[in-house]
């Protein structure tokens, strides 16, 4: 057994900064989450933004002001250390990329955990639906689109999507699987024709890495929890912390906890 198959060792390596890579494919079966941390004076507007845009921003948990333990999704864990990599934004611009946010922590911060599409990938693998970024050992490709989100207070902007190439004969199955997970982005937001949602070049993702789209495959797009980062860049708040795209928080929840019949 390698360390990547050992739950305890994975968590320990991430906490200690020994692993700072993408979390796709790690601890299959455990739900992963996007993280947004912002000052209390912005928390209500962001909560409203998530409620109005549940496809890209499905709320899993909101942590009390100044607290960093996600008691609902991962009791005993610490959001300041338990992600592989974080982005620090100042005035809407990424100013640092770190593996520990203890020195940035203040008592007025509110943390939000949002559902992540990595959750349904283990079901793809079980059913023989390929997950190209796992096959190629890279981060999932993510793209800005022309799909507008609903405004909420100071927050406004367009949706970010993740893309997975799906063989034509597996497309229906992929849609059926993901539609059972509304808490983690659910069914695709768009299928094929990337130009129709404002994506000019699949080989040039805005976040993550490019993957190969093979003959007989269709690019399929899911709403993505990196959307808040794009929205934050629009508003340019003084200070925000997020996960680095693809470097998620691994909760104690199981993927099946979010499966709906």
From Swiss-Prot:
Its EC number is 4.2.1.-. It is an enzyme of class 4 (lyase). Keywords: Lyase. InterPro entries: D-Glu_cyclase (IPR009906), Putative_hydro-lyase (IPR038021), UPF0317 (IPR016938). GO terms for molecular function: lyase activity. Disulfide bonds: none annotated. The keyword Lyase applies. SUPFAM superfamilies: PSTPO5379-like. Belongs to the D-glutamate cyclase family. This is Putative hydro-lyase Nther_1142. It comes from Natranaerobius thermophilus (strain ATCC BAA-1301 / DSM 18059 / JW/NM-WN-LF).
């Amino acid at each position: 057994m390698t360390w990547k198959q050992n739950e305890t060792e994975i968590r320990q390596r991430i906490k200690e900064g020994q692993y700072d890579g993408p979390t796709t494919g790690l601890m299959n079966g455990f739900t992963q989450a996007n993280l947004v941390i912002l000052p209390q004076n912005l928390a209500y507007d962001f909560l409203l933004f998530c409620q109005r845009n549940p496809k890209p921003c499905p709320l899993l948990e909101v942590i009390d002001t100044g607290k960093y333990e996600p008691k609902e999704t991962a009791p005993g864990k610490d959001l300041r250390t338990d992600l592989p990599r974080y982005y620090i934004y100042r005035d809407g611009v990424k100013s640092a990329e770190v593996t520990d946010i203890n020195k940035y922590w203040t008592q007025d911060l509110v943390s939000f955990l949002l559902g992540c599409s990595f959750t349904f990938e283990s079901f793809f693998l079980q059913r023989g639906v390929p997950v190209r970024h796992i096959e190629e050992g890279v981060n999932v490709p993510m793209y800005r689109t022309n799909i507008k989100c609903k405004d909420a207070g100071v927050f406004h902007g367009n949706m970010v999507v993740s893309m997975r190439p799906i063989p034509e004969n597996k497309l229906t199955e992929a849609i059926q699987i993901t539609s059972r997970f509304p808490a983690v982005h659910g069914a695709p937001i768009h299928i094929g024709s990337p130009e129709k949602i404002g994506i000019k070049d699949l080989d040039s993702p805005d976040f993550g890495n490019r993957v190969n789209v093979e003959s007989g495959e269709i690019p399929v797009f899911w709403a993505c929890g990196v959307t808040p980062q794009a929205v934050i860049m629009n508003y340019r708040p003084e200070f925000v912390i997020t996960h680095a795209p693809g470097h998620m928080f691994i909760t104690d929840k199981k993927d099946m906890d979010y499966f709906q019949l």
